[in-house]
């Protein structure tokens, strides 16, 4: 979504779903995995909305929907691409919205060639470039422009932050867009390229690729079209069922294209609702737990890039849009971290930041571990021995470390692999031969510490400590703060320049209690930041690049406005409207719907009274409405920037997407993605089917490691499709739930879902045992024979699907095989996410012979 709209966060909030006229849920079992938010889907259904669930499995979400369509795991782009084609073929797009608010009229340069011409490749493909083959993205550019932020002419491995939870499409050179055709007839304008690209995604091809019927597909496409436009809006909801593919980012891109064509972005009851994988996954990415970003989705400096802060700013800034203020964002971050030590003379300590070269993702780190190139590892809030694809390879990697620190609530599999794991049981690993020194440090749960969750709708909510942690349990904040103090104490007499980044850090947070717990509120206040007088910032607009302001995360500026913890606000719903602006705080600037300038027409009037949300008040000369306007408050709809305008001032008054360089929603992405400017259907890395569109079967840019510990399935030996999923009763890798008696009683055993026809074909008995195999591993599971997971008919044959929850491991009150043992380490190239929603397997009756 970042490359499509300008920010990677959900465009809307869950309460707004109640005002949708149609809700399409794909890649999510929302009723079971996000049950609190699902109440608003049920509210919409009671108001007459159509609720459609498209998924390989029939779940509780399907049961409460008005329509369920079963599809093959891994065929999402084929289905969504069919909707794009349906919109274009039947002329159902929102014409004024598309022409005025998107890059549909923009003309693309002559070098661009489509996958329809190059049989599954975009122009610029070089199979010998880089580790996996790379695209020369300059061939995708707007006519007369060049990429602004790309570090070189190729698509760099580390640029995927543009497509993540908060990334953006990057800058464009001055003068954009250089050429437009508002009639949308130019053969190289984005609109015509889009039509040609998706022309083959007919209902018949969708049915062939996905395993549904043409009639089922048309019913979904028509429902979205009929419930979009001036008077009506539709929403699309997804979760990790879309992200965990080698084309995960491009699946989400296809949904963004649909919503832009239908005019649903920035409007009440519309948008794209990204349901995150746990309570604060949005917050963890906002604050940069990913290797390639800094807080607020600023890019990490590159090791091969020279020129210091000036060159970094030059590559990060966009001539138009709010990323034109990237210099203020990065300098304010540096001031928050290094305070008085950060001066203009020393580039505000920019050189203190680590520089990255290529890939430092979790999977590449473990590949290096397997080669004994990693000496130590700290695992916090992570259980790679169960939760990562090809968990066996991860356990083998851990066994080659010199030391390992695991911080968790209980002793999870990543802490016990050296004496209790499938490899210990089989003899592949021997405890006495493992050199790793393992430290297990008990952590505090969220009820034992103050802090925040930033949830699926960018809502930062404060949680208060309810009880003191027991024994040696400590919060992660306590751990890192006191670890920092000890390191600084060790280095206090150092004169080595490499130690200055640690010694110069602002590390003076107030502490409290017998264990000297640092104040979480003080950290939140630092994220918010201060102005030149030391006053708390009210938002990010006052940030400056001269060193007079500080902010630990520019997106969070305003969360501590007026020196008050805004995330702790709890005004009851009956005392405010449904937007609930005084319940907690949402980034940025407490906006609940992003791009809400698009809820008004180009002249600033609501598209309809029924969908009135934000509009231009001609008398007051400002934008107003039910939410914080996502636009410059005093910029009129007819504002036309002068030629020398920069940053936000370069965005027209009728261009709502203020984080994009041109202020437009991007149907076509000229830069920011590694695998193509448009989504296209590729088969999963492992698939029993041939690509119905191209001879190129899988995403050519997918990230592969070609390791002996990660062999690929042969097509003939593994005839079935596996998809993994979550249960309501267990949480992620199971460390927090398999140790809880009543949750373990509710879901007491690892199981596999199979259709009755597959059970007969393989001799599987309901309640009996089955062994599921891939080339990586084999696990055993109890058999659940059910009609809920349908076989797929494609290419004239039937292929069965097997459903596996992934919560089990060797520890806890309930133990079982880990579904991730079966998976391969093949990743989406943009965000390095594993493909565990679609792979192949074999299944046989009986227990796994060890």
Segments (PLM) and residue ranges:
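Long, well-ordered, tryptophan-enriched scaffold segments
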Residues: 62-228, 318, 486
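Long, contiguous, secondary-structure-rich segments that constitute the structural scaffold
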Residues: 478-533, 624-627, 632-634, 639-650, ...
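Extended redox/cofactor-interaction regions of prokaryotic respiratory oxidoreductases
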Residues: 1-36, 40, 47-49, 153, ...
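Glycine/threonine-rich phosphate-binding loop and adjacent beta-strand/alpha-helix elements that clamp
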Residues: 436-469, 480, 668, 785, ...
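Conserved short loop/turn motifs at secondary-structure junctions
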Residues: 205-212, 238-246, 275-279, 382-386, ...
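Short beta-alpha connecting loops at secondary-structure transitions
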Residues: 63-71, 417, 425-426, 442, ...
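A glycine-rich phosphate-binding loop feature that marks nucleotide/adenosyl-phosphate handling sites
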Residues: 100-103, 223-224, 239-241, 271-282, ...
């Amino acid at each position: 979504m970042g490359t499509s709209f300008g920010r990677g966060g959900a465009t809307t909030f869950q309460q707004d779903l109640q005002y949708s006229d149609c809700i399409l849920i794909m890649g999510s079992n929302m009723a079971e995995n996000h049950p609190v938010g699902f109440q608003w889907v049920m509210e919409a259904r009671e108001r007459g909305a159509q609720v459609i669930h498209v998924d390989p499995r029939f779940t509780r979400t399907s049961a409460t929907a008005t329509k369920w369509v079963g599809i093959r795991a891994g065929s999402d782009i084929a289905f969504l691409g069919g909707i794009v084609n349906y919109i274009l073929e039947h002329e159902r797009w929102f014409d004024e919205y598309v022409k005025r608010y998107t890059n549909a009229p923009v003309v693309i340069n002559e070098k661009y060639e489509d996958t329809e011409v190059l049989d599954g490749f975009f122009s610029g493909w070089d199979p010998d470039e880089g580790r996996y083959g790379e695209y020369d993205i300059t061939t995708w550019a707007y006519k007369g422009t060049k990429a602004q932020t790309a570090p070189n002419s190729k698509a760099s491995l580390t640029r995927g932050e543009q497509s993540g939870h908060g990334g953006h499409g990057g800058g464009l050179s001055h003068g954009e867009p250089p050429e437009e055709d508002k009639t949308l007839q130019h053969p190289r304008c984005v609109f015509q390229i889009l039509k040609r690209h998706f022309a083959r995604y007919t209902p018949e091809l969708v049915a062939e690729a996905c395993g549904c019927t043409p009639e089922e597909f048309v019913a979904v496409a028509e429902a979205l079209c009929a419930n979009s436009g001036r008077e009506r809006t539709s929403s699309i909801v997804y979760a990790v069922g879309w992200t965990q593919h080698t084309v995960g980012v491009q699946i989400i891109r296809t949904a963004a294209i649909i919503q832009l064509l239908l005019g649903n972005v920035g409007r009440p009851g519309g948008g794209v609702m990204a349901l995150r994988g746990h309570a604060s996954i949005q917050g963890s990415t906002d604050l940069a737990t990913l290797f390639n970003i800094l807080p607020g989705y600023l890019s990490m400096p590159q090791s091969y890039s020279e020129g210091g802060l000036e060159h970094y700013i030059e590559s990060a800034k966009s001539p138009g849009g709010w990323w034109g203020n990237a210099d203020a964002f990065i300098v304010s971050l540096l001031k928050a971290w290094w305070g008085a030590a950060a001066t203009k003379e020393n580039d505000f300590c920019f050189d203190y930041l680590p520089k990255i070269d290529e890939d430092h993702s979790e999977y590449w780190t473990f590949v290096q571990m397997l080669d004994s190139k990693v000496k130590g590892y700290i695992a916090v809030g992570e259980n790679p021995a169960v939760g990562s694809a090809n968990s066996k390879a991860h356990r083998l990697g851990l066994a080659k470390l010199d030391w390992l620190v695991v911080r968790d609530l209980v002793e999870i599999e990543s802490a016990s692999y050296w004496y209790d794991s499938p490899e210990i049981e089989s003899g592949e690993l021997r405890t006495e031969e493992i050199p790793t020194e393992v430290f297990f440090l008990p952590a505090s749960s969220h009820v034992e510490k103050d802090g925040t969750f930033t949830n699926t709708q960018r809502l930062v909510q404060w949680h208060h400590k309810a009880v003191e942690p027991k024994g040696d349990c400590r919060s992660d904040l306590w751990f890192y703060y006191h670890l920092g103090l000890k390191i600084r104490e060790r280095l206090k007499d150092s004169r080595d320049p490499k130690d200055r980044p640690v010694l110069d850090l602002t590390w003076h947070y107030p502490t409290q209690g017998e264990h000297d717990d640092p104040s979480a509120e003080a950290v939140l206040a630092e994220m918010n930041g201060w102005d030149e007088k030391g006053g708390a910032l009210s938002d990010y607009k006052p940030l400056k690049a001269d060193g007079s302001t500080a902010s630990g995360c520019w997106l969070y500026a305003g969360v501590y406005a007026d020196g008050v913890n805004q995330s702790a606000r709890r005004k009851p719903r009956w005392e405010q409207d449904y937007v609930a602006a005084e319940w907690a705080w949402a980034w940025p600037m407490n906006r609940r719907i992003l791009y809400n300038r698009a809820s008004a027409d180009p002249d600033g009037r609501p598209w309809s009274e029924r969908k009135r949300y934000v509009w231009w008040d001609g008398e007051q000369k400002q934008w107003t409405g039910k939410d914080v306007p996502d636009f410059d408050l005093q910029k009129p709809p007819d504002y036309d920037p002068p030629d020398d305008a920069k940053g936000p001032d370069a965005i027209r008054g009728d261009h709502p997407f203020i984080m994009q360089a041109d202020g437009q929603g991007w149907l076509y992405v000229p830069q920011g993605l590694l695998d193509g400017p448009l989504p296209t259907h590729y088969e999963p890395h492992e698939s029993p089917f041939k690509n119905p569109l191209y001879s190129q079967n899988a995403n050519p840019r997918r990230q592969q490691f070609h390791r002996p510990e990660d062999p690929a399935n042969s097509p003939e030996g593994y005839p079935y499709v596996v998809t993994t999923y979550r249960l309501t009763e267990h949480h992620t890798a199971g460390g927090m739930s398999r140790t809880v008696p009543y949750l373990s009683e509710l879901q007491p055993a690892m199981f596999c879902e199979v259709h009755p026809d597959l059970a007969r074909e393989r001799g599987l008995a309901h309640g009996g045992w089955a062994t599921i195999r891939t080339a990586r591993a084999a696990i055993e599971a109890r058999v659940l024979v059910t009609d809920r997971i349908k076989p797929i008919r494609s290419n004239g044959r039937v292929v069965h699907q097997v459903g596996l929850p992934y919560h089990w491991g060797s520890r806890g009150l309930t133990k079982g095989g880990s579904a991730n043992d079966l998976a391969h380490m093949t990743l989406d190239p943009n965000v390095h996410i594993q493909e565990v929603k679609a792979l192949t397997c074999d299944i046989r009756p009986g227990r796994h012979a060890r």
